A protein has these predicted regions:
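An N-terminally biased module of ancient metal coordination in phosphate/nucleic-acid-related enzymes
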Residues: 1-58
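Active-site gating/metal-coordination segments in enzymes
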Residues: 54-142, 147
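Conserved small/polar residues in nucleotide/adenosyl-binding loops
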Residues: 154-156
């Protein structure tokens, strides 16, 4: 049975060609090459990359670059802005991309924290329409109004 890491965050070093949106609180990089070497060293067959919001915000281009280099190792989840009025189109375009496997919604730091926010409902509906799972970052507010959503809570 293949061993899959379900959440890794790829990012290149901070440089003018690919500047970070905010500083890293740890590694200088977690490139595709570094990830593949680490995965191979411990017998991990593949991974789901969640594009690094702290490095690139809503731009998944680095994760897609890694996917294009190692399509046999990775699939990609991208952060989406649930407040974007065009969220339906954003999710539809993402779903059509080679390697796309899900979306990530962040409910923190100035973004919708209310489970009843209409953008969240639109994002969930768009993901469901296109068969994409949702990776939900919602520290401290997980159960406040989304009883109909099946949520995996483990993060190890």
């Amino acid at each position: 049975m293949p061993i899959i890491d379900v959440q890794v965050h790829p990012f290149d070093r901070n440089h003018p060609g690919r500047p970070w949106a905010s500083p890293s609180h740890g590694l200088d990089s977690a490139t595709g090459e570094e990830m593949v070497a680490a995965m191979n060293s411990v017998g991990v067959d593949g991974a789901i990359m969640v594009s690094s919001f702290s490095a690139y915000e809503y731009d998944p281009s680095y994760a897609l670059e890694v996917y294009n280099t190692y399509p046999d190792k990775f699939r990609v989840v991208t952060p989406v802005d649930a407040t974007d009025p065009a969220i339906d189109d954003v999710v539809a375009k993402w779903a059509a991309r080679q390697g796309a496997r899900g979306i990530r919604i962040r409910m923190r730091n100035g973004l919708p924290m209310d489970a009843d926010h209409p953008g969240l409902n639109r994002a969930f509906a768009a993901a469901a329409k296109h068969g994409l799972p949702v990776n939900l970052l919602c520290w401290g507010i997980l159960d406040k109004g989304l009883p109909h959503i099946q949520i995996g809570r483990a993060h190890v």
